[in-house]
Amino acid sequence: MRLILNEQEIVDGICVYISNEEDIYPEDVEVKELSYNKRTGFFAEATFGLHHKQLMSDDISEGIIQFLEEYHNFNPDVTVVELQFDKKKGFSALVFVNEAEE
């Protein structure tokens, strides 16, 4: 199965990732920036309380997997995330579930 997640779902994944790391509620996390650079990849900056956290591509992808596992009962062992950016369409994530890599 393949899914395409929109930018809000990516943000939700970032919030879940940080909430799991910091033992807070996802609602307490605010994503301030989501960006893409050809050289460095994807980047997110979030705040919670007075704290700041920066995430790179791998952490963002892991957050999406955690979000799908916790809120939609996906099996993280068979879920693969590919972050995408298009100048016209913005941010998205292509999610492969239970598909053998070719």
Curated annotation (Swiss-Prot):
A matching Pfam family: DUF2653
Protein name: Uncharacterized protein YxcD
The encoding gene: yxcD
